[in-house]
Curated annotation (Swiss-Prot):
Residue intervals of the BPTI/Kunitz inhibitor domain: 95-145
Gene of this entry: WFDC8
Domain of life: Eukaryota
One annotated GO molecular function: serine-type endopeptidase inhibitor activity
Organism: Homo sapiens
Cystine crosslinks: 51-79, 58-83, 66-78, 72-87, 95-145, 104-128, 120-141, 154-182, 165-186, 169-181, 175-190, 201-229, 208-232, 216-228, 222-236
InterPro entries named among the record's database cross-references: Elafin-like_sf, Kunitz_BPTI, Kunitz_BPTI_sf, Prtase_inh_Kunz-CS, WAP_dom
Protein name stated in the entry: WAP four-disulfide core domain protein 8
Signal sequence, start to end: 1-38
Subcellular localization(s) per the UniProt record: Secreted
Tissues where the protein occurs: Expressed ubiquitously, the highest levels are found in the epididymis followed by testis and trachea.
Main localization (coarse): secreted
WAP domain span: 44-91, 147-194, 195-240
Length: 241
């Protein structure tokens, strides 16, 4: 007589405590749970946020450091940028990140964009970690980053209160043609630029606790070389050197 071994001993197959129906039910339940788990994984395969657009024409792709968003720590996403997949902060402009040398023993010359001085600079990359402000050569760095601040000035978006909305752009390079990434009542949006004086406005603060009433609408309303800049409200400011 056939029996089934359990922790408590043996049950005959014709025993009332054993049933092929029970086996079939458990098998179907297991398959259903696996299918549900697979569907949930498929639905939740992306973390919030948008990856930056690829800015280079890639003739050779570099080895990927991730395959999906969940290969990346915390809120980072797996993005294709500078000819390879890498973990990136979807809420920061890559070319504005500080230089990161990495923490392995290998050394190779790479290039990063020095946003403060507005130029591409070489550095020694140690091969692990780091960030997305990391390019194989100077040409790639310049192509990816030199247009992150386009000529022109953001137009006025009159508002007394600001809502925190997901940004539709992170920097000017995310916007088509001559449009700029501008502060609006609801996050940052691409907008047609105004004609401006030479120089660039100081960097915008990450967060404004209060939006001041506009002191100007465009550069022509500011004295001498001052520019009309968006800095928690429009105001005349000395251009960034």
């Amino acid at each position: 007589m056939w029996t089934v071994r359990t922790e408590g001993g043996h049950f005959p197959l014709h025993s009332p405590t054993f049933s092929w129906r029970n086996v079939a039910f458990l098998l179907l339940l297991s398959l259903a749970l696996e299918w549900t788990s697979a569907m949930l994984t498929k639905k939740i395969k992306h973390k919030p946020g948008l990856c930056p657009k690829e800015r280079l024409t890639c003739t050779t792709e570099l080895p990927d450091s991730c395959n999906t968003d969940f290969d990346c720590k915390e809120y980072q996403k797996c993005c294709f940028f500078a000819c390879q997949k890498k973990c990136m902060d979807p809420f920061q402009e890559p070319c504005m990140l500080p230089v990161r040398h990495g923490n392995c023993n290998h050394e190779a010359q790479r290039w990063h964009f020095d946003f403060k001085n507005y130029r591409c600079t070489p550095f020694k990359y140690r091969g692990c970690e780091g960030n997305a402000n990391n390019f194989l050569n100077e040409d790639a760095c310049r192509t990816a980053c030199m247009l992150i601040v386009k000529d022109g000035q953001c137009p006025l978006f009159p508002f007394t209160e600001r809502k925190e909305c997901p940004p539709s752009c992170h920097s000017d390079i995310d916007c088509p043609q001559t449009d700029k990434c501008c502060e609006s009542r609801c996050g940052f949006v691409c907008a047609r630029a105004w004609t401006v004086k030479k120089g660039f406005c100081p960097r915008k603060p990450l967060l404004c606790t209060k939006i001041d009433k506009p002191k100007c609408l465009q550069d022509e309303e500011c004295p001498l070389v001052e520019k009309c800049c968006s800095h928690c409200g429009l105001k005349c400011m000395d251009p960034r050197r």
